Amino acid sequence: MVAGIICGLAFCVLLYNERITFLSATSLARFSSCARRAAHDAATDGRREKIDGMKEEHKLEYDADICDISEGKWVYNRSVKPLYSDRICPYLDRQVSCVMNGRPDFDYRHWQWQPDECSLPRFDPKRALRKLKGKRLLFVGDSLQRGQWQSFVCLVESIIPNDQKSMKRGRVRSVFRAKEYNATIEFYWAPFLVESNSDLHIIGDPRKRILKVDSIAKHAKHWSDVDFLVFNTYVWWMSGLKINSLWGSFANGEEGYEELDAPVAYRLGLKTWANWVDSTIDSNKTRVFFTTMSPTHMRPIEWNNKDGIKCFNETRPVKKRGHWGSGSDKRIMKVVGDVLGKMKVHVTVLNVTQLSEYRVDAHTKVYTETGGKLLTDEQKADPLHHADCIHWCLPGVPDTWNQIFLAHL
């Protein structure tokens, strides 16, 4: 009976709470599992506490059809150590190696995401490698997706003998190889997924970037024969300016492009990606995942720190349930839900946005590099202009994203 009430309430929430409706293109799938939830309740003699009051030991094992991963809280656990460090894993970019770059506090590495409805299993590197045996895993997207890729590599590499692993880095494509498992964990740089004039040689001024929102073939030819594809695209669209968008010939893109609002251009680009997936991917061979947007934290007033400077000096997650700042654009989330909801090929949504929204403490801040050089002392003393509140320290939040990803595998 409790199961039925919960399922009914969940349906009402889906109808009336916009934030939840567009977080997953497969949200309605959880209602098909109501019978399974009821069966579980019956097996435990109906002794279920309300979700908000459940003790950890009574929680269900993680089941994506039942558990809403976006609802939960961060719990501090000093006894749980990260599976790697930026001093040990040799594959991390200096940009995200916060401790090596002088970050003095370490608590940000000891927060664990605890969903309300279930227990999220810890990342098991042996299980991950068994899942990948004889397969290719490819992360596609921007620097935040590269962070998730590096996190995954570092989470598994420590249990692989040195002579059984290798890394080949490139400007566009990088490949980590686990020889013993005949597996690769790869990254492909495509910040917009669709083609742009800023793909290979990055154009810092967004006013000079031009997107070919109807073209993806140049990138997509590198995504074939892959067993697991994990996509993301968000932050590069959010410059605050209109997007220079082009159809047809790209030869003289400086002439004839149209300036579109970011959500409009994003929808066109994501539809191009979705059409490629639907027309190309064999779902019997390849599983497709989409990581939702990674929040930025630029306005401390949004988490009631009136004297703060961006995310600088933040040392704890936001406690307010449902905190949602301006760094996560709900219009973009709605586009993702709309487009993925109409696709023929099933795409598993890695819904990381809400849980990441709380983590104002976990960005690289001033403990990072820019232009290939570490910030100077003078730059560190000016966090208003130099604190990076977009990227995440590693170990850190992207490790939780990969916990969720592995749970889906």
Task: Show which residues each predicted segment covers.
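A compositional signature for long Ser/Thr(±Pro)-rich, low-complexity
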Residues: M1-L409
